[in-house]
Amino acid sequence: MSAACFAKRGHEVVGVDPDERKLELMRAGKAPVVEEGVDELIGEVIADGSLRVTSDAAEAVAATDVSLVCVGTPSAPDGSLGVQYVERVTEEIGAAIAAKDGRHTFVLRSTVVPGTTLGVVKPILERIVGPVGEKYGLAYNPEFLREGTSIKDFDAPPFTIVGASDERDAQAVEGIYAGVEAPVHRCDISTAEAIKYACNLFHATKITFANEIGMACQTVGVDSRKVMEIVCADTKLNVSAKYMRPGFAFGGSCLPKDLRAFTHMSRVRNAPLSMFEA
């Protein structure tokens, strides 16, 4: 989907995928996923030639200046992150960079734990191509797209995060977002990786919080949706940057007491609140 959105914004894009069935669909101007507007968008950019697709990574690298790597990072049985696809693609792109004339920017977009780009991707590229710098650059640029609204999210993201090895690569990444109305935050590569996880974990926390409030309210006959509607109307404290500083103390005369009372109320009604109990 990102490939089509970048093509729509005037870039020449070469999409790479090992699945020939997906490639054939896209060559026919059809999306390999079901989502509003994507079929039409892919049909448009395939027809005008701004997007073409291939299964050959070397072909794509030779024809472009920047590689955006978006591959799966499945969970291992122990919960750790599987980076086998990242490693495989890095090997392919590294070989292509070594063989091409000119400099190339390798940008990882997959969600990976902090340290992965520098600890997994960088050593592979250095082994194949050489040191980061003259021949290629390295960056991390997470995407913030939700299923079902990905085109809208691409056009109006909350921000763009760019973690890069040097100024040239930061500018290269920023350049592909020209025209996207969103603030750009530059940082180091590992910080960029951590930001993506912090965002996802915050979303998970919000969902859990809302569900636990809902469960507790149900036990005492309170309309939890009304509660959350008014809670979210407070943008000074509740929906804001307040209390979001790492290391901020939890204590005082109210918060611990109120937490104990609310969790006890729910617990005795057979609705323990796991997040708050923790």
Where do the protein language model's features map onto the residues?
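NAD(P)+-binding Rossmann beta1-loop-alpha1 motif at the extreme N-terminus of oxidoreductases
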Residues: 1-30
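ATP-dependent carboxylate/acyl-activation modules
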Residues: 2-5, 259-277
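N-terminal glycine-rich dinucleotide-binding loop that anchors FAD/FMN and/or NAD(P) in oxidoreductases
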Residues: 30-51
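Rossmann-like NAD(P)(H) cofactor-binding subdomain of soluble oxidoreductases
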Residues: 74-144
